Amino acid sequence: MKKKRREGKKEKNMRTTHAERVTTHAAWFPSLPGAYKLNCDASFDPGSKSSGVGFLVRDHLDKSFIAISNPVTSNDILIGEALAIREGLLEAISEGTLSITVESDNLGIISCLMYPSKAPDLKILPIVEDIRHISSYLDDCNFSYIPRTANSVVDCLARRALSVSGRMVWPNSDPLLSGDIASDTRSVSCSSQ
């Protein structure tokens, strides 16, 4: 029994590249100065068979840098979650971001990004490999699981993607987006007490 725990602990501490670190957080909190947070999510409506992704990049002051809703062609939420991470990373890189923490409420995908020996579901394998490759272009890239309650902003962005016809870049002045960010921040302060 002790040997199993030790082996599990050893595997948990194993890191093969800078892009494969994962942590778990109970709530959203800002990044360190000079770094950014990328939150990602996907949404699927079985009735209309439409799906979409949402992602948001924020700086250490909790200021929204990029907020995007994008309809995607997928009838599987797992594929959508992986696509959201990949699209978010590509967008962050195109904006010049070099240090980022990727946060998602999909523990399975985050775990696969952390542990290369953990095989992802075959339907997302190519996307996970893309994410690993893309993240290698960043100076620092970490992956972190957060619960859905701390990911409400991008949940909203992903749901909005179901009602738009194409990629939508949301302005920082969008009152709903600002309200959602404030609620995520409040959940952080409540959980830290």
Report each predicted region and the residues it spans:
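Primary recognition of RNase H-like, Mg2+-dependent phosphodiesterase/nuclease domains
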Residues: M1-Q193
